[in-house]
Every structure is written in C-alpha cells, then in structure tokens.
C-alpha cells in the first residue's frame, strides 16, 4: 500500500488501501436464462401479425353429397409502440478542477481527467439502463404488461400494453399447497398441463423443459415439504443431498445467489436475489416471496425485445442498436453533454404459457 499524507495531520503519513466501491444491489436473471430474443427494428412502432390456420379431421360423405370445404385463414395484427428511455449527464470543469482521483494510490497527486470522469459516468449510465431493461422484462413475465411507468403507452383505461388483454387470454393462477402433509405433485402436473395448453394453438416446436422463478418463502416451503423429503429418502440420485441437507445446487449460467432444485421435470430457481434498489435504497425483489412463475424452455420466439433507433438524422430508418451514447462539447468549452438512450419493447407472444403460482399453506 502506498504512503500518503494523513488528512487529519499533515505531518504524518498513512497507508492508503484500494478504494472500496459501494454499488446498488441490482441483480438480473433473464440474460443468464436466455429467455429473450432481440429484434432490431428501423421504426418506432412494430406490427405483430397473427394468422389463425384451420385444419381438422375430414368426415366422410355420400358420393352424391356436396363436398366438404375448409375455412380460410383468419388474419389480424397488433400495433405496438416502442417506449423511449433516455438518461443524460454532463462533464463540467468542476468535475476535474483540483479533484483527486478517488482510486489514486499515490500521494494524492493524481487528479481527475475528462477520460476518467467519462469512464465513471459511462459505467453508471450503462448499469442504470441495464437494470431498467431487466426490470421491464421481469414486469412482463410477472404481470404481462410493458414497462412504461409515465403513461406514454396509455390507451383509454389501460395504463400500458397488456399482452393478456391483447391476446384475449387470462393469466392462469394455480395455488400450490406446500404444507408439511401435502403432496404437491398434482398441482405441479396441472401447471405443466396449463403451459402446454397455452402453447397448443401456436405449435412453436418442442418444449425442452420447464423453469420456475420462485420467491423466497415459496422456495423454502418446497425444500421443507415433508412429502418431498420422504420421496428422496428412498431413492439414490443427485437430488438427495440438496433436499436432505437443505443446501440446493446451482443452475448453469447463474451465480450461486440463485439456488436451484429440479423435481418432477421442473427446475425451481430461488429468484429472491433478483431485484433492484429503489430511490430510498430499499431492495425490491422481482418475484414476491409467496409467488412463482412457471415458463417453458425451448419455445422459439416466446419472449422478444424489440429495439427502435434513436430519433436522429444519422439513425432514423436504420437498423436499431441496443443502446446509444451521444456526446457533445459546446463552443464555450465549459461543458460536455452526455445523452444516452435505450428504446425497447419487451413482448410475450404466448402469454397463456406463463403460469403464476401462489403459495397456499
């Protein structure tokens, strides 16, 4: 550690450690699971077209009867406006004038530079956009609605776009009893059946698995359920140790904060660590403690993130980027303006295949 002057006694020196950086407790999960597919648009509004095909069993007819006919395909579309999320900052002479770099390891002589201040601001801005995208995706999964808190997508009585409403379906909610004497297998079988039924009209390939994003109380009740414990006592396999010791494993691609256990063909992920800090510093989990959200894996294009280009001459009518950074120094040389934006819409094209479960004890 370097020696620096003691700020309380300039006649003495102290050892300076590396800088301890306190960051907001913002944790995401959707990227690691690979749930969303990006689509880069050239416009600020997209049209999701839907075609309903008609195919059914053909019945026999008498030879002199009129032949059977097949109904034509039904077509409709859904217009969706992509919200605009901008966040600005600036660098001024006061940010570097006589300011010592916070992570300087020399004798307080390294001063801030435009480059170092820019790097710090870039990191903070990117993290703000990143957790906003994650919160928007989790809002879609849990409520079926598009994140637009200021009402830019308001339509009549609807504060924002709701994919359950747009597709004319109702969110399936399955209470699950995880009390000590309950056998939850039937409830989870019903959940998987509801997911398959939600996918049936679309035929988007085979389901490769099921995953549940679970709140802390729900996950704890599952681990402590007596039926679950008894079921694994008399079998030999990788599931025994996590259940009997109460130490769940991890899921490929997720860090150790997300404990998991796989039973009955469902991977349960304790998603209580995923969330964000609000303005007051309170941690807000994406999944409520007593809730769980069940999703199919391997379904093509179930979740989408549509990006729109920035509203500038150099970007309009061109393929969008995931995010934008614009920087301008004024002629008076006393400020550098930083303008960043993300323009995205998260969409669930098969909302009936997302099943909500509530803990019932």
Predicted regions and their residues:
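Short alpha-helical segments and helix-capping/turn motifs at coil-helix boundaries
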Residues: 32, 193-198, 322-324
């Amino acid at each position: 550690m370097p020696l620096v002057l003691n700020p309380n006694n300039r006649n003495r020196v102290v050892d300076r450690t590396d800088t301890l950086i306190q960051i907001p407790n913002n944790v995401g999960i959707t990227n690691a699971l690979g749930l969303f597919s990006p689509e880069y648009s050239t416009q600020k509004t997209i049209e999701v077209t839907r075609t309903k095909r008609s195919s059914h069993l053909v019945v026999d007819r008498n030879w002199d009867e009129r032949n059977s006919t097949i109904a034509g395909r039904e077509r409709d579309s859904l217009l969706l406006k992509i919200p605009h999320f901008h966040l600005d900052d600036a660098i001024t002479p006061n940010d570097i004038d006589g300011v010592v770099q916070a992570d300087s390891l020399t004798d307080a002589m390294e001063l801030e530079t435009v480059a170092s201040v820019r790097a710090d601001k870039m990191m903070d801005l990117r993290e703000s956009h990143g957790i906003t995208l994650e919160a928007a995706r989790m809002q879609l999964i849990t409520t079926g609605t598009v994140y637009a808190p200021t009402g830019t997508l308001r339509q009549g009585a609807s504060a924002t776009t709701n994919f359950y409403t747009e597709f004319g379906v109702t969110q399936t909610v399955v209470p699950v009893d995880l009390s000590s004497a309950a056998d939850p297998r039937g409830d989870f079988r019903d959940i998987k059946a509801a997911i398959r039924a939600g996918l049936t009209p679309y035929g988007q390939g085979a389901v490769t698995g099921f995953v549940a994003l679970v709140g802390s109380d729900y996950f704890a009740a599952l681990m402590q359920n007596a039926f679950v414990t008894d079921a694994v006592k008399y079998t030999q396999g990788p599931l025994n140790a996590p259940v009997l010791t109460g130490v769940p494993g991890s899921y490929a691609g997720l860090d150790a904060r997300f404990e998991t256990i796989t039973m009955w063909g469902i991977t349960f992920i304790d998603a209580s660590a995923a969330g964000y800090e609000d303005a007051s510093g309170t941690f807000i989990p994406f999944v409520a403690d007593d809730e769980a959200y069940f999703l199919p894996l391997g379904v093509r294009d179930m979740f989408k993130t549509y990006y729109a280009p920035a509203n500038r001459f150099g970007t309009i009518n061109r393929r969008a980027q995931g995010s934008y950074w614009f920087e301008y120094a004024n002629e008076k040389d006393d400020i550098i303006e930083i303008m960043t934006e993300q323009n995205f819409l998260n969409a669930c094209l098969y909302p009936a295949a997302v099943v909500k479960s509530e803990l019932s004890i």
